[in-house]
Regions:
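A short, basic/flexible loop-to-alpha-helix module at the beginning of a structural domain
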Residues: 1-11
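Conserved Rossmann-like nucleotide-cofactor binding loop
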Residues: 21, 44-45
Length: 132
């Protein structure tokens, strides 16, 4: 599936943010046979805090193995407390392994979310003024 260049006019699930939470949500949807979703990320890449905080010495404050997902365990961490670049790299591996770029629109900020009760759906206003 090619990457999305514009959000579709309607999607079953919109995931706001491509940090760990958004990534895991997207993977779990796929594992349950749901592919009608989009990930909206205001940043330029996946990774959330691990994308944004790669200053010298940045590292996790819990043991690295806790950054492994139960369905995608990582056992080859280089240190007991992994540094930011290694965590970011493991996130990128998940993105590649689950083809998440095909479902993501980067550099896309969600400005507002409004529930449309009469239609039983959410309407998202994006920074480029489009509506999803």
């Amino acid at each position: 599936m090619p990457p999305l260049h514009a959000p579709p006019p309607h999607t079953k699930v919109a995931i706001i943010g491509a940090g760990f939470g958004g990534i895991v949500m997207a993977i779990r949807l796929q594992q349950h046979g749901i592919y009608d979703f989009i990930i909206l990320e205001k940043g330029s890449d996946f990774g959330g805090t691990w994308r944004d905080n790669q200053y010298p010495g940045a590292a996790c404050d819990v043991q690295s193995h806790l950054y492994s997902l139960s369905f995608a365990p990582k056992s080859n961490w280089s240190k007991r407390y992994a540094e930011a670049p290694e965590i970011f790299s493991s996130i990128q591996d998940l993105v590649t392994d689950y083809n998440l770029r095909a479902f993501c629109r980067l550099n896309t900020e969600v400005l507002a979310a409004h529930y449309q009760a009469e239609r039983c759906l959410w309407q998202l206003q994006l920074q480029d003024q489009s509506i999803l």
